[in-house]
């Protein structure tokens, strides 16, 4: 089991998210390759023969192996520089094996494609790869891999030549690989950013302590008078001590100096050590500022959500106390803030808003379509209607005992209960009366939204609930764009309301609180009543209150009386307009009743668009006459007969000689030709 876990752990480092053969990405954050503008997204990137992709998993594994060798080199270089003389031992063999791996990497680099910094495309030309490598890091890589230890033994048998030791320190150049690794891991969302940064900061601190201790010991070891050194003053025969004791003592001095503790047991004794301590303390100032700044930033970022939450709770509590709000409202405020804090990572509405509309629609369709599809209100509607509707759905969480809808509130949204439960209550005589309950999969608020009536109930959650919210604007737009689906929705609502005995509605236009039977007026009446004109506009809460009340009470006589008065006013307006225009047909058309009755005892306006047409006699090539199109074919034939001297016309054709027998096919501005059979 441990072997499998270890393999999976290293695969997270080695496997790159970018698949070069299929251009398939699971995460684009750590991949630097971008397609050029206009490039086909499904076009595979094929490199030349013997050229290796830098995103190849095997090459990533090779880089990870080199990083482990770099960690070894970072520790052994300062340690050998200060404590160990070069000789043919186990460390000598290991160092040369490590150098061999880095020599192989130098050769391998000539066959690895690189990412162009200007075009962000992979360059696989061997010539360009070689020129780029030779002009950048090749010389440093060679110097950091050169076998200076064997050369030191060749020219200096005791292996203590300082020059070769300094040259061996060039192996620290390999640390750039560790820096690149941390830079890549910080952008990789598969790893925790906080712990990656902490690991990097701890590694920098340990390396600084290790190097400072080794360098300070080297100064004491090379000083002519061992007793006048920082370690010789305490241990006069320190050179005879074990390697472990000397190394631990050096680290002790380094870390006490780095942390500015300074116990005083080890301190500089000669000018060389004093000079080194001066530069080391100056370095410590910058390193300490770097560590404190980064750790502070990480901790602040980690605790910012909690701090914001506490500030919000404190502000809400102070606001409630200052304004002496009731305890139930205070509890709702605090519950809402607490729930928002807990579900902040679940909703992520800000993330969705930053995505393109097509992606948001796909996400909404995947999450909400199965839920909306099973709602009674949308049974029988088309898939296109639901797809348009779910794109504008918002999911929200509500804590227990929070009001979602208030009684007599203006209708704004339709709600679908996904989880939890809500109660319906009506405020009567100073008390809330329980009217019903909604469970998972049910809707509420549809009556107020579809009829633009004040909300009949107060809807309050009884437990933690997830609710989908559909705005009235989105629903109305979808219903008008899909008229057949709108008719189905209104019929579904009508069937539900007809099956209920009574629905309590508090009418704000009348006094008292009564329970009334609320019936649907039907889709056709609802749709026509929304048109501009002199009819009832149910979308305007301030329009014709008496007529709305009459329809709501199903008082047919009152509806007829009110509409009769409106018809008289309408006729006066049309007659005045006709006389001013001087139209010959205006007097005839003003006699027509602009209102017609519907099949459900609800009278609605029959609004007719006026069209101007030019009429001609087929047998004469005289100028035509411009008239207003009447309401029937017979009226049009009669009017043409009057205009052309009493001719008995029986046939109407258009400019293309096509016979016309229906006024609906005539457009404004058409030329009509009359003839007799």
Curated annotation (Swiss-Prot):
Regions that enter the bilayer but do not cross it: 249-268
Regions crossing the membrane: 64-84, 91-111, 135-155, 166-186, 201-221, 273-293
Extracellular compartment spans: 85-90, 156-165, 222-248, 269-272
Residues holding a nucleoside 3',5'-cyclic phosphate: 377-496
Subcellular location: Membrane
Keywords: Ion channel, Ion transport, Membrane, Potassium, Potassium channel, Potassium transport, Transmembrane, Transmembrane helix, Transport, Voltage-gated channel
Outcome of mutating residue 256 to S: Increases calcium sensitivity; facilitated entry of calcium ions
UniProt key word Transmembrane helix: yes
Consequence the record notes for mutating residue 256 to E: Increases rubidium uptake and both cesium and calcium sensitivity; facilitated entry of calcium ions
GO molecular function: identical protein binding; inward rectifier potassium channel activity
Mutagenesis or variant effect for residue 263 to F: The only mutation at this site that do not perturb the channel activity
Main location: membrane
UniProt-annotated stretches for the region Disordered: 568-601
Basic and acidic residues composition bias: residue spans: 568-577
InterPro entries noted in UniProt: cNMP-bd_dom (IPR000595), cNMP-bd_dom_sf (IPR018490), Ion_trans_dom (IPR005821), K_chnl_volt-dep_EAG/ELK/ERG (IPR003938), KAT/AKT (IPR045319), KHA_dom (IPR021789), RmlC-like_jellyroll (IPR014710)
Entry note about domains: The segment S4 is probably the voltage-sensor and is characterized by a series of positively charged amino acids. The pore-forming region H5 is enclosed by the transmembrane segments S5 and S6 in the Shaker-type (1P/6TM) and contains the GYGD signature motif which seems to be involved in potassium selectivity.
Subunit structure: The potassium channel is probably composed of a homo- or heterotetrameric complex of pore-forming subunits. May interact with AKT2 and KAT2. Interacts with SLAC1 and SLAH3.
Described function: Highly selective inward-rectifying potassium channel. This voltage-gated channel could mediate long-term potassium influx into guard cells leading to stomatal opening. Assuming opened or closed conformations in response to the voltage difference across the membrane, the channel is activated by hyperpolarization. The channel activity is enhanced upon external acidification. Also permeable to ammonium ions. Blocked by tetraethylammonium and barium ions.
PANTHER family per the UniProt record, alphabetical: POTASSIUM CHANNEL AKT1, POTASSIUM CHANNEL KAT1
Protein's recorded name: Potassium channel KAT1
